[in-house]
């Protein structure tokens, strides 16, 4: 069932995607050479971050109760903070789509997701350290923060080289840790939905549903190690971005299509899995865009 919230989430995603591709058309067309396909994908980093933010925004205004419930209990005015975050998501999505004030918006975006980690997900993970999903949530939002700061580092390289360097290093280390952790989880629990391994089990009707977990782990593990060691880091980050982009289409878009007649909560969950995976792709591609193309320059980042 398509509720008004789910409808607005879908329309926002489609609208921002179309606008982002249009604005990025010159960068996409300019990608040439041996790594042309990856370069074309990297050119869409801003769009791949903006679109999920736009998808998330509507549910902060008229969405499920869990959005307001996620605000820490010690903070007053839960509806206000939910609406505030929705406005922030739309502002960041618009900035990244139009390529205006990217340094400011991506810096603030990184701070916002880091606050989510510190105020919401890390306390939950520490309260039950054996819960693997708690740490998956921590690394997910920490990776989103890293993607924002990778963009901020890229766009502050000329004016603040030292700040740019540590922001990109932070992003590289965070995404390395997340990729390695997620790879291990995929190998241990291949039946769970691939990419960012949260609670959802891959539906049995998806072809090769368990194999998807192993394939994801086989790509994430070497890519994470490459990022950690800073060896072929740009290719490693782009590979993670390409994997997550592919997973957004299959199985997550396929699951959304199959859920078109399902209860609104199931459709909302499917939309959120698409946005999560797509945003993780955008974060990895943002890091790739900030890293040097020439492997001999790895010492600078």
What is the role of each PLM region?
Residues 68, 75, 101-105:
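Polar, glycosylation-prone regions of secreted, cell-surface, and some intracellular proteins
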Residues 75, 201-202, 243, 263:
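Residue-level signal for alpha-helical context at structural boundaries
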């Amino acid at each position: 069932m398509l509720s008004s919230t789910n409808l607005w989430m879908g329309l926002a995603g489609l609208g921002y995607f179309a606008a982002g591709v249009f604005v990025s058309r010159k960068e996409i067309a300019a990608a040439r050479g041996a790594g042309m396909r990856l370069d074309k994908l990297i050119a869409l980093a801003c769009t791949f971050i903006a679109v999920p933010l736009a998808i998330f925004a509507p549910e902060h205004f008229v969405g499920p109760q869990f959005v307001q419930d996620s605000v820490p209990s010690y903070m007053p005015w839960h509806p206000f903070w939910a609406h505030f975050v929705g406005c922030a998501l739309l502002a960041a999505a618009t900035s990244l789509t139009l390529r205006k004030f990217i340094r400011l918006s991506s810096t603030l975006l990184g701070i916002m997701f880091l606050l989510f980690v510190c105020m919401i997900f890390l306390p939950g993970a520490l309260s039950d350290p054996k819960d693997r999903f708690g740490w998956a949530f921590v690394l997910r939002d920490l990776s989103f923060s890293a993607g924002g700061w990778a963009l901020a580092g890229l766009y502050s390289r000329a004016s603040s080289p030292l700040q740019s360097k540590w922001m990109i290093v932070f992003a590289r280390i965070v995404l390395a840790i997340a990729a390695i952790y997620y790879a291990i989880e995929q190998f241990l629990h291949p039946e769970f939905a691939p990419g960012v391994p949260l609670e959802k089990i891959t539906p049995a009707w998806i072809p090769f549903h368990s194999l998807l977990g192993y394939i994801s782990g086989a790509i994430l593990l070497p890519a994470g190690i490459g990022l950690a060691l800073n060896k072929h880091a740009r290719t490693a980050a782009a590979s993670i971005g390409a994997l997550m982009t592919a997973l957004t289409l299959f199985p997550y878009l396929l699951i959304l299509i199959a859920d078109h007649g399902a209860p609104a909560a199931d459709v909302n969950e499917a939309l959120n899995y698409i946005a999560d995976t797509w945003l993780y792709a955008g974060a990895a591609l943002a890091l790739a865009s900030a890293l040097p193309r020439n492997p001999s320059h790895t010492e600078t980042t």
